[in-house]
Structures are given as C-alpha cells and as structure tokens.
Amino acid sequence: MKRKMLWSSLIVILFVCILFLNKIVDFIINVEWYKEVGYLTVYFTKLIAICKLMIPLFIIIYISIVLYWRSLRLSIIKYRRAFEVNNDKVKNEKRIFIIVNLIVSFLFSYAFAATYWYRILQFNNSVPFNIKDPILNLDVSFYIFKLPLIQSLHSMILSLIIFLGLITLVTYFTLSVKDKVIWRNFKKDSGKIDILNSGITRFAGKQLAVLAALVMICVSIGYILKCIGLVYSQKGVTFGAGYTDAHVSLLLYKIIAAASIISAVIIFISILVSKVKPIIVSITVIVALILIKSLSYTVVQNFIVKSNQKTLEQPYIKYNIDYTRKAFNIENIDANPFQVKDNLTSQDIDNNMDTINNIRINSFEPTLEFYNQVQIIRYYYKFNNIDVDRYNINGKFNQIFIGTREINTKAIDPNTWQNRHLIYTHGYGIVMNKVNSVTSEGQPNFVIKDMPPQNSTDIKLDNARIYFGEKTDDYAIVDTKLKEFDYPKGSENATNNYDGSAGIKLGFINRILFAINQKDINFLLSRDILKESKILINRSIKDRVSKIAPFLNYDSDPYIVMSGGKLYWILDGYTVSDRYPFAQPQNNLNYIRNSVKVTVDAENGNVNFYIMDKSDPIVQSYAKIFPDLFKDINKLPSDIVQHFKYPKDLFNIQCSVLGKYHVTDPGVFYSGEDLWEVAKNQKQVSGEKYSMESSYMVMKLPNEQKEEMILLQYFNMRDKDNMVALFGARMDGENYGKMVLYKFPAEKTVYSPYLFKQKLNQDTTISSQLSLWNKDGSEVQFGDTIIVPINQSLVYVEPMYLRASGKEGIPEMKRVIVSYSDKMVLAESIDDALQQIFSYKQDYNQENSNESQIETPSYDINAEKLKEAKSLYEQALEAQKNGDWSKYGENIKKLGDIIDSLQK
C-alpha cells in the first residue's frame, strides 16, 4: 500500500512538473538573469510580496469556503426530513470538496496577489503628498497608495460572496430535483410536491439571507467608496466633484451607506427569528434611497445648477484647475510677455551668433534617411533612430544629430542560426553630424562616421560595439569557437571576442533550460558552444529596463551618449497615476513625473536607476519598497549628466494639458474664451495640416546670458492659425525641468508655422524658384520649420531639400528660407540669408545719409573707364578673329589694368 502511494505521489509530481515545465524553466532563467544584472533582490521582493499576500488570502478563502460548506451540510441535515448516511459516499464527497476548494482558493488568491502585489507594497510604504483634497480633506497619498488596494479587496470579497451564493443555488436546485425524483414532501391529498414549503427551500432561503446580509455590508462599503470616488466624478463641468456631487450625491451616499449597515443587521436578526418581512422592507428601503438619490441629483442639476452654473460651479472649477496644474507639474511655469518687435539689428545677430550657429538646417527625417543610405556600410546594419543632443566639440557648444549603427538580424543572408546568434552578435559605431552644417552637396557634414569610426572631434570613443540597443531583440551567444563579426575591413572582416561582463554561462544544465525556453534544439546540438560561452538575453533597452522595474513607465525614445570612451543609453522613467483627485486625465493618467533616469551600458548591458526628482512621493515609495534599486544621481559621471534631456513624451502631455489649463481664472475657464492648441504645419505648401512636433533647440532665452538646450513648442489659438505663445522646457544644469512660457500680444497677428508656409507660397520670387526645381525628375521637400526667438523678435527658418524622384533619391539640403518681419530670403545658408536681410537694410540707411556727399566727377571717371574697358574688349575680340594674337594680348593687358584700377 505504501509503495503504491509512493508511486502515485511520484506520478503526480512528475505530471505537475511536465504541466508547469515552462513556468519552472522561466523561473530558473529569471533567477539567473536577475542575479547577473544585480537586481535579484528586486525580483524576490516581488515574489515575496506575492507570497505574503497570497498565503493569508488562500487561508482566509479556504477556511471561509470550508465553514460555509459545513453550514450548508448542517442546514441540509436539519431541513431534510430524512438523511441517508453512506460513509464511502461521504468520504468521496469530502475528497472532491477538498480538491475543488484547494483549486478555487489557489486561483482566487493567486490571481489577486499576482495582479495587486505592488498595491499592498504601496499601501504599506505610502509617502504623504502633503496636499489634501478639498471635499473630504484626505491627503492625496490616500487616493494613490491606499484606495486602489481597498477597492480591489472590496471587489474580491464581493466576488467571493457571489461565488458562495452560486454554490448555495446549485446545491438548492440539485437537492430540489433529487427530492422531486424520490417523491420527498409528497402531499397525499394533492399528489404534488410542495417545493415552496419544503425544508430544502427554507434552508436555501436562510443561507441566501445570510449572504444577503454580507452583501449589504459590501454595499455599505461600496457607497463609502463612492463618497471617496466623487473626486473623480465626470458629471460636472470639469473632472472632479461638482456642486451637485458635493451637495447631493455626497449626502445621499452617506445615508445609503448607513442604511445598508442597518439593513445588514436587520436581515441577520430576521434570519435568527425566522422573519421575512423585515428583510423585504430593508431591501426595499435601500432601493428607494438609490432611486431618490438619482432623482434628487437630476432635479438639483437641472433646476438649480444649470441656470446658475457659472457661479455655483466656480469653486469646483478652481479645484480642477489647481489640482490639474499640480498633477502635471505645470503650476510653476515662468510666464513672460513677448512683444514680437521688428527692431533686430546686425549687432543683435552678432550678439546671438551661438544661437544662429545652432539653428537646425538638417531636418530629422531626411537626415535619418541619409544615414541609412550612406552610413549603414553593409545591408545588415540599420539606424533605427537618430537623437538630438549637444556636445562641446573642439571648444564650441554644438547641437548635433547622433545615431547608432545597430545589427539588423532579420536582414542577414543567409539567416542561419549560427549567423544570427553566434556571428552577427552586435552593431558597431555611431555617426554624428552638426545640425547646422552641410557639405557642398547639401548632405550632413559628419564629424564621426564610417567603420571603424573616423572621429574629427575631441570626444573620446574607444569602444563602439553595441550589444544592447533599441531594436536588438535577438539573444546572442558569445565566447564560442566562432569569431564574432566586428565590422567590414577592406576585402576581409574584422572579428572580435566578447570581453564584456554580461551574460549567463551556458553550462550543460543551462543549455537544456534555454533549449526548452527558446524551443530550439541547437543549444544542445551546437559544437561551437563551450563551457565558458555565455548567452546575452533581454538586449532591447526598453525590454531590459522594464523587466527590472515594470512598475515604472518609460519614454518611447532612448538616446545614446558618449562617456569615458564608451557608449551608454539613457532612458527616462516616469511615475504615473490615474488617481490624483480633481486632476483632468490625459492619455489615461492624471499624474506624471520624470522621476527616474536610467542608464544602460551598450556593451555590458549594466542597468542603473537614478532618482531625478526626490520630491515625488511615488518614487519615494518605490525607494522604500526596493531599497537596492535606486542610486544617488550625484554618483553619476558629470559627462553623462550634462546630456540629460527633458523627455518629449512628458513634454507633449504637458503641452496638451497647457492648451486649456494655462488659464487660472475660473470664469474665463468656464467661458472657454482662451483655448490653445499645438500649432499646425504642412510638409508641403499645399499639403495637409498636421500638429507640430516639439523640437530640441540650442538657443539663448530672452534675458539669459548664454545658450542652452530647450525643448520648444508653438501654440495657436484653438481652430485658428494665429500663434499666441512659445512654451519651452529647460534642461541644462540646475535649470533642468524649469518651464518657460512666452505669451504674444493678443492684439497682434503672429505668424504660426502654417501661416509662414502660406506667406512663403505667396512670395513670387521664392515660389517661382521652387516651381523650377520641382520638375524634370526632381522633387522639392521642406524640412522642419524652426521659429527662433531672439531678444523680442522672431526669426523663421525653413530648410529646403531637393531629391531625385524615386525611392533611391538622396535628399540634399540646397537652400534655406529665412523670414524676419516682412522680409523673406532664399539663400544657400542661414548666414547668407541673414546677411541679405540685415545688410541691405543697413546699406539703405547708409545710402540715404550719405546721398548728398556723392561726387559726380568720381561717377564720371568710373563711367569713362567702363566705356574704355568695353572698347578694349571689343578690339580684343576683333583681333582674335583676325588671328592677330599680338594685338589681342595687348588689348587684354590694357583691359586688366583698367579692372585693377576700378577695384582700388
């Protein structure tokens, strides 16, 4: 018997292992990977939290079901007139019940714990915001850290009660059918079964009444949560509680909650004394109160609030404005008037040459296209993206484009397992060009290019290998018998053996595990894998980072920087919530902070998390939960810190919010008379409108002393093309995260990018020139429209590209259109355009002031010399025709003497 039990147990264990084999393998690999990257404690924090939440939940649910099932059995015995005892049947039922209960309890507890593990951690590690909501006077931390767990527990308990109710109903109907079959409660005088008066029916009624009492307690808690949830109401003028919510809904929710508790007590007592009427009355009262609440809300809203909405809703609109601006971190914007004057001089241009010299004439899309046409070197490389940054290059502060040459394993031909995973393991090199400079052909002027990198800057770059990248999705096996391809080198290829620290050792056991994990037998069959070989997994930057810290949100655009001769990725991490009271949601969230900066070593894959915003309570909570996760940002090398950028994803959300919430006066906000939107533009003069993307610029802000990088966006009046403001985020040094807003005069028409395009189209000289270029197999394309504030003036810049028609045409920057005031110039460079705009204005004034001093004899002498030069030229031509080369040379010499005298 014991041997039989042993074999049965072994079979069950083997079956479970096979059933959960993939989960077991994933767990072992995860443990090895988290250990390799140095965040094993973070992984186990999650697992321990799940266990801490799951085990007590499992016990509570299991015991609750056991107790309830026992009460069912006792009730069945009590209310059935006869009860047959079959010991074998009872044992079988007990075994089945235990198995079912274990499964149900496990599923309930695991599903809840796996989904909400971080909520209990946040509940226990909450950090106060020191901001209270204006309705219930609760700290914002309650809504963000505690309320979600309370709501989740409430939903789970209610689901459990409903589940027990279903068990009761199933039991009732099963026994009722059984009674009918065996003719229990048969009335001899009628020959019918009296189901309604049967013991089974009375049993079911009492069991369901007990559950109804528990449901009423849940209803009471639910209405208390509804009171709290009024800060998220969407019934008023703005998000958050309105007048009717605060004066009607809040009161009646409290009354319903209290009445539900009383009803629960009445129902419970009525069960003990076998009274049905009080139960019906109490439930009827609750239903009536709910109907009264709905009716009262409708009456007050339509007959009191609607006709006096602006006055009654004003304080609640103010709450919405204030809390939305706090939640999206736009309450401390440095707003200044910008007069838009037309008084720039050449001296102003000279004083702002560092701004002028960093205006971007290389536009993003054509530059990325050019990178992928000219600098991939081989077809299996790809530039997935280019990033804007700033570097001190040879002593000058320059805005640049930089791109990484990543391996594109899908393009490898032949795409064999060895090629894809053992040979072509990494990308190689970066390409950099200044945004303000092009070659004579109109192509980006590279300062770092080719393979191996040809570097004309003073920026150190010793290791250009990219094992971890934006789109490096495949695993790589390194330190094998095969040499890794490094980069093409003439007729041969340079090779490399990985000497980084990343990777999990591929011993025999791990080869088996990865063969199962990747569903690939090559791990076991390959003769190239050695005992010291390692596998690099999770090589995509975003996947790697989010696997370590999945509770953070991440920016969509990691960017590469050079530091200490190596390459590092920087990725912005956000703490977000959709639970901030009264704050208007945007993109399914209503609180966001750029609280974390993440760096990833492009060769070793080392990941480091740094707290950027120590004032954020959410990141403080995470730091308490995961004490080994975050590092002090002061320990980060300064040459990485100086490349921190304000992230576009966050800025774009703030721009969307600012379009409405730049208004702080509730009356003006209610009237909707000052709404903004992101400015529109066109790719082509006659093309469709599209919303402008925010752009990084190096410039000197008004009243500032030096240039810095700014993330800038332009605003129009909503549904209009008149520009009303410039909005920017600073990011250099101590100014990181500071916001600036420059408002234009309301009475003045300021050209938006779209109006600038229309003005360009109406310029006869420029439009005719564009028409000439835009034919005969050529196509004119416009780059990024840049509007540069200088002092209190605006300068508009539009690069113009020319490309041969067809897919293989390379875009070349041929001209720059510059507009200032009522002047618009088409030139080969910004310098030429500005020279034309400001020099002819200056020369005109000089001519006017010196007009009376011009001497006529001087003019006559020059005219006589020109006449003589013409005569000599004609004589030289005549001598040439006659073959008199002596006379020809004499005339040409005299002509040269006259030209020399005219130049003096």
From Swiss-Prot:
Transmembrane segments: 9-29, 47-67, 96-116, 157-177, 208-228, 253-273, 279-299
Bilayer disposition of the protein: Multi-pass membrane protein
Keywords tagged on the record: Cell membrane, Membrane, Transmembrane, Transmembrane helix
Main location: membrane
Lineage top rank: taxon: Bacteria
Pfam families the record matches: UPF0182
Subcellular location(s) per record: Cell membrane
Keyword Metal-binding: no
UniProt GO cellular component terms: extracellular region; plasma membrane
InterPro entries: UPF0182 (IPR005372)
Family the UniProt entry places it in: Belongs to the UPF0182 family.
HAMAP family: UPF0182 (MF_01600)
Name the record gives this protein: UPF0182 protein CKL_0015
